[in-house]
């Protein structure tokens, strides 16, 4: 799951197990968590969607029928322990994810600090938010014209080839850039 705004999908998955398979809510939630990874991208509070209870109730007031939970238990899925007046989509995602990660080591640390309230019994550095550093597949990411500038041929570019980037004559780099721009437009 990519960011908290996608967290409602976990409710649909849970509902299908509760209504379609006859599982009790907690068994369905555990199954969904065991098969869900949540990636948080935003290490600032403003980036985490939160909604007032009346708005959430308007769309999910039938939660007991839908997922087998009374309203107070349903609304608590969008909260850390202690609760607030708002339904937090990131907290909902974390209630249904067996693995949580940030998108870099630094972001993982920032997320541990920001989301620590979800795990009040843990020290901040024990908060189970891992870090996965995004990467690039150079062979498909690097345009053939840039590859030729870096390697002098059409062989697949390698990370070590970028050490030569500063040696590329500016007019040659500009020519390839403008050609790629023309192709894009």
Predicted regions and their residues:
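Catalytic cores of carbohydrate-active enzymes across secretory and cytosolic contexts
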Residues: 1-185
């Amino acid at each position: 799951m990519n960011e908290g705004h996608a967290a409602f999908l976990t409710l649909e998955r849970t509902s299908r197990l509760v209504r379609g398979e006859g599982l009790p809510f907690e068994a369905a939630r555990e199954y969904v968590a065991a098969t869900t990874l949540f990636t948080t991208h935003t290490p600032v509070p403003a980036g985490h969607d939160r909604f007032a209870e009346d708005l959430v109730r308007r769309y999910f007031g039938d939660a007991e029928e839908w997922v087998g939970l009374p309203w107070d238990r349903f609304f608590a899925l969008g909260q850390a322990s202690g609760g607030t007046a708002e339904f937090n989509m990131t907290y909902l995602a974390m209630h249904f994810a067996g693995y949580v990660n940030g998108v870099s080591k630094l972001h993982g640390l920032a997320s541990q600090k920001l989301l620590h309230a979800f795990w009040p019994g843990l020290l901040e550095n024990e908060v189970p938010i891992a870090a996965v550093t995004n990467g690039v597949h150079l062979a498909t990411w690097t345009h053939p014209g840039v590859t030729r500038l870096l390697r002098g041929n059409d062989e697949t570019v390698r990370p070590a080839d970028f050490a030569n980037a500063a040696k590329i004559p500016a007019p040659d780099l500009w020519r390839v850039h403008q050609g790629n721009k023309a192709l894009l437009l």
